[in-house]
Every structure is written in C-alpha cells, then in structure tokens.
Regions:
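Bilobed "Venus flytrap"/periplasmic-binding protein-like clamshell domains
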Residues: 73-76, 97-113, 145-146, 165-222, ...
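Acidic, polar ligand-binding/catalytic clefts
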Residues: 109, 113, 118-184, 258, ...
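Alpha-to-beta junction loops
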Residues: 117-118, 134-143, 188-189, 226-239, ...
Length: 317
C-alpha cells in the first residue's frame, strides 16, 4: 500500500530537525544497579531468508508489493529522522528530504527484503499510530509498541521483535543516582512518554513520586530530564542506552531481577508489557503470519545484536 500523508509535513519537518545530529560517541550505560554496555555492533545477525518465491499478492495491504509502515521517526534508537541516506536509512514519504533509520527501520527492511517488497516509511505521531492501522492508512506499525492486552484488542500483533526491560534514567549528579530499588525514587519528580506502560503502569508504583504530565515524545521526555524539569524518567532499556550513549551525564537505573523492580501480577503480564511487537489491522492474520515467519528466524540474542547496531549509528539527539 502506498500512502502519502502530506498534511503532517510541517510538523514532521520540525521533528526531523530535532532528531538530526552529528558524530556518534561509543555507547555506554552506567547505573547503581547495572552496567548496560552494548555488545559490539559486529555481533551475529543472521542473513535474511529469501522468501521471494512466496505468492503474497493476496495479502491485504501488500497486494501492490509495497509495505507502508508507520513510526514516529523520533524514538531513538527504535527510530529517528536524519537528513541523508547513510547507514541504510529509508526516505520518509511524507517528509521530503528526510530519512528514517533505527532498529524499527532495520526490522522493516529485513521483512521487505525477505519477500521482495518495497518499504515505505510514514512519519506519524505516537497517538495516531493505532488509529492509522484501523483506518487502513498504514499496513503496519513498527514503532517500539508493547504487546499489551489493550493494544492487542485493537490490532493484530506480530512478534515479539524485541524483548525489552523497564529502567529509569537520571543524571549522574542526581540524589537518585544511587537508587537500588523503585522505593528509593520516592519524592522525585518524574515522567515518561504518553500512551506507554512506563507512564500508565510503572510510575504509579513509585510511592511518593511526584508524577508530572506525560511527555509527547521520547525526545521531549529526555529533554525534561536534561533541563532539570524532572529528576528521572521511566522507559525501556534500548531508549535508555541510546540516551546515555549521546549524553554521558545520564545514568541508567535498572532494578531487573530484584524485589525492588516494577511489579506485575504474573510473569506473563510482565512479558506482555515489555515485549515489543508489530501491529497490523485486526483480522489481517495473513500479514501478521508473513511477518512472524521472518521474525521467528531470529532469537533474543540476535535481536539484541541488531539493536546494538542501531545504537552504534544513532545520531546525536
């Protein structure tokens, strides 16, 4: 499906300028509870299986051989905007002169390469992603979306294509930089991106936290931390690693595997809230299954290796 959303051009050009950057320092992440050092970007990522012999002409959305994928293009390292085609970036169809790159783009390209489809990237606001699937504007969203029960009631989800963990990010000079559990974050001002489990489910678990209004985007969330508007933010590990790689004054707080971690009723509930999937229209199991066939060829370690590659080429934000 080929769709051009020119009506959001002005907005997304502003996003593209925010998301552009320069040289990339070596990724690193330090925290009181963990040191999250990404593996070398040359770690093993399997070649894409050649499925071009499969007849996909009857799969809803890709009858014309084009997969139209929605993402924010402002959620590094999952996706970002840059102004050139370096490192495999793909042109953003509704933002002339701008290109999308990141882990989501890499996953989307692997799926398209497998079936011989053309990849079209459309930039969209986070809150517009699911409605765009439901209206048929997008064929799929590959946008760092958690596979929550609420979301899966509205769309089909392929994957997971990444297994995330919940973390917080603060500044090295913060009084919260030595936190050993979420209880140690009591009294701090905090936020997370709107429409995410980080804001809706995680921050409310921190007793005494001064939860601020949600941020419209991941860059806005991180800006609120860097400017001192909040003491810490809640997000997932890849977003945190990407932030720390670009700003060495930030530190990751991971309580994973401890009693002081964010809690869910069951491990199954935890998984649904942190596993990342691809959304397609409800009932479009043909497209979901086609994507799952490509994703199932990779394991968690290989997904992590691909994420490391994305972080390594992420521009400064």
């Amino acid at each position: 499906m080929r769709r051009i959303l020119a009506t959001v051009l002005a907005v997304m050009m502003a996003v593209s300028l925010t998301a552009c950057g320069g040289d990339t320092p070596a990724p690193s992440a330090q925290g009181s509870s963990s040191t999250a050092e990404p593996a070398a970007p040359t770690a093993n990522v399997p070649p894409v299986e050649d499925l071009t012999g499969e007849d996909t002409s009857a799969i809803p959305g890709v009858e014309d051989g084009v997969l139209t994928v929605g993402m924010e293009c402002a959620y590094a390292p999952y996706n970002w905007t840059q102004m050139n085609a370096d490192n495999g970036a793909v042109a953003i169809s509704n933002v002339p002169g701008a290109y999308a790159n990141g882990y989501d783009v890499m996953i989307a390209q692997r799926i398209c390469d497998a079936y011989g489809w053309e990849l079209e990237i459309v930039s969209s606001a986070w809150d517009s992603l699911t409605p765009a699937i439901q209206s048929g504007t997008m064929d799929a969203n590959i946008a760092g979306q958690s596979m929550t029960a609420d979301r899966m009631a509205e769309v089909e989800m392929a994957g997971p294509y990444y297994y995330a963990t919940i973390v917080c990010v603060t500044t090295k000079d913060s009084a919260f930089a030595t936190a050993k559990s979420i209880a140690d974050l009591s009294g701090g001002k905090c936020t997370a991106q709107s429409g995410t489990i980080w804001y809706d489910s995680c921050l409310p678990q921190i007793e005494g936290a001064k939860v601020q209004p949600p941020a419209d985007s991941a860059p806005a969330m991180l800006m609120s931390l860097e400017t001192g508007t909040v003491d810490f933010v809640c997000t997932d590990m890849p977003t945190a690693m990407g932030a720390v790689a670009k700003n060495p004054d930030l530190v990751i707080l991971s309580f994973s595997g401890t009693d002081g971690d964010f809690q869910f009723a069951t491990e199954e509930e935890r998984a649904e809230n942190v596993n990342i999937g691809i959304s397609v229209a409800k009932g479009n199991t043909q497209l979901k299954d086609a994507m799952d066939r490509v994703l199932s060829a990779m394991n968690e370690e290989q997904f992590n290796a691909l994420m490391d590659q994305a972080i390594a080429v992420q521009p400064a934000i």
